[in-house]
UniProtKB/Swiss-Prot annotation:
Residues 261-285 are annotated as: Disordered. This is GPN-loop GTPase 3. Keywords: GTP-binding, Hydrolase, Nucleotide-binding. GTP binds at residues 13-18, 174-177. SUPFAM superfamilies: P-loop containing nucleoside triphosphate hydrolases. Heterodimer with gpn1. Binds to RNA polymerase II (RNAPII). Belongs to the GPN-loop GTPase family. It comes from Xenopus tropicalis (Western clawed frog). A motif (Gly-Pro-Asn (GPN)-loop) lies at residues 72-74. GO terms for molecular function: GTP binding; hydrolase activity.
Length: 285
């Protein structure tokens, strides 16, 4: 039987560890066994048990303290991940060979690991050799995405990971439970965005015509090919977590030997589900 994996990615502070913790608890309530592997050598703490912890292999602090290497925080993390890529046998021994595994890999947040270095690509290829079906889960903080230019930055980061890793990917806006009513109303348009209208709304903020043309070209590429869409993630809402999990399961065909169901919303009614999600919260006191 195949094994399953989520590669949980996103900028620092986007809620990767919280997502892993919440998803483990949610899957536990569904009688599904899910385990977590920490791949962040700079992680300080997390509130869930881990199947494997890269800090047992190598830590950023140890690398930075090595005077022969003379690395700072970013260089130290890159060194750690390259060292990890040369020691996948350590990960293999930690994972074992149990069939039907479902594992969340909590990854570091430095974007250069996905855009400039092949380390994460090597990891994906190795997991696939071990018969894992891998889905990328790219998280962005919804509190960061309430402005059009910041949203475009988040979209490009998600797109970079998608193009680099060449695996199915679900993009998720986290911390929806922390937004106020006004912010929730603003963020709704970014879940299934019309990139052209977003540019029109901010056209008076461009300081350079070249910058405007570049932004328009990027937005056109994203919009024309429907390359990036986001799902809301509210850890206090079971239905919201179910929708996210169903999309990921569908991407990796989890439980394909059973009668598999499509995600709850089709493209036609996706916006209706988002409307219901925000309407429920608008009615809250």
């Amino acid at each position: 039987m195949p094994r399953y994996a989520q590669l949980v990615m996103g900028p620092a502070g986007s809620g990767k560890s919280t997502y892993c913790s919440t998803m483990v608890q949610h899957c536990g309530s569904l009688n599904r066994s899910v385990q977590v592997v920490n791949l962040d050598p700079a992680a300080e703490h997390f509130d869930y048990p881990v199947l494997a912890d890269i800090r047992e292999l190598i830590e950023v602090d140890d690398v930075m303290e090595d005077r022969s290497l003379r690395f700072g925080p970013n260089g130290g993390l890159v060194y750690c991940m390259e060292y990890f890529a040369n020691n996948f046998d350590w990960l293999e021994s930690c994972l074992g060979h149990t069939e039907d595994d479902y594992i969340l890999f909590d990854c570091p947040g430095q974007i250069e690991l996905y855009t400039h270095l092949p380390v994460m690509k090597y990891l994906v290829e190795q997991l696939q050799q071990w018969e894992f079906r891998v889905c990328g889960v790219f998280l962005v903080d919804s509190q960061f995405m309430v402005e059009s230019f910041k949203f475009l930055s988040g979209v490009l980061a998600a797109l970079s990971a998608m193009v680099s890793l060449e695996i199915p990917q679900c993009n998720i806006m986290t911390k929806m439970d922390l937004l106020g009513k006004k912010a929730k109303k603003e963020i709704e348009k970014f879940l299934d965005p019309d990139m052209y209208s977003m540019i029109e709304d901010t056209s008076n903020r461009f300081k350079s015509n070249k910058f405007k043309k570049l932004t328009e070209a990027l937005c056109g590429l994203i919009d024309d090919y429907s390359m990036v869409r986001f799902l809301p993630f509210d850890r206090s809402d079971e239905e919201c977590m179910n929708i996210v999990l169903q999309h990921i399961d569908f991407a990796i065909q989890y439980g394909e030997d059973l009668e598999f169901k499509e995600p709850k919303e089709n493209e036609e009614d996706k916006s209706e589900n988002f409307d219901e999600f925000f309407q429920d919260r608008a009615d809250e006191p």
